[in-house]
Amino acid sequence: MEKQFELLYHDLERNHWWFNSRRKQVIDMAKPKKGEKILDVGCASGLLLEDLTKIGMSAAQLNGIDVSDEAILKCHQKGFKNTYVMDGADIQLPLESFDLLIASDCLEHIENDEKALNNWYSLLKKGGRIVVFVPAFMSLWSPHDEVNYHFRRYTNNELVEKAKMAGFKIQRKGYWNFFLFLPIWLVRKLKNLAGGEKLSPEEMDSDLKPAPAPVNAVLKLILSLEKFLLKAIDLPVGVSTYFVGTK
């Protein structure tokens, strides 16, 4: 992604409603266990790794990779030494060595996503688990995707079919951020109609910006309610889509 947005995200990701709620949802679906060897693909500055330590995981069992030198430096500064600068489609770590692999908003940045999924499959132990979140629906495509260097957005069927082709057994699939889907869709459509799709790279902007504290709190509350609902049901649409699988 553009460097200016990477730096902004590093500042935002701890408390911003989107990043904060997504980490909680991912952890809830991943069900990590003490002693498991865990890999976070696209670990950024290590906030998910931090959250995992807060629920009993040790830094020694946590691993991460990211394409950003600066992100991995931040991980090292936080004490996560098993973090490396690597390409998410060609992770050079021991095969069949991880119990759990998490990739939240990473696969869409990789041009050859099928190669990446095959690579991730090879890294998991037999019976190992994977949780993947990606942006949903090309109808939501906007300058936000451009500045973040996304290659695509997915339907759940597209994501699941590619996961199955790599060999994963699907345990759960669906969408996340259901309640905010329509407002976000409308905002992006209006931006595109206003000429957002014709902006130069210098004029494009990301949707993720600091939110006023009351707004941030309300949006976190909405996604907390959704997390509760997702314990019992799957949702038909959302801003993101996911699958949970096993090897």
What residues fall within each predicted segment?
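A structural helix-start
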Residues: 69, 110-114, 134
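A C-terminal cap/extension of S-adenosyl-L-methionine-dependent methyltransferases
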Residues: 2, 180-247
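A short His-aromatic
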Residues: 105-109
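Short, glycine-/aromatic-enriched active-site segment of Class I SAM-dependent methyltransferases
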Residues: 9-11, 130-152, 156-162
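Conserved N-terminal segment of class I S-adenosyl-L-methionine
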Residues: 1-96, 100-104, 117, 212, ...
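A short glycine-rich, Lys/Arg-flanked "PGG" loop and its adjoining helix->strand segment in the class I
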Residues: 114-129
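Conserved S-adenosyl-L-methionine
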Residues: 168-178
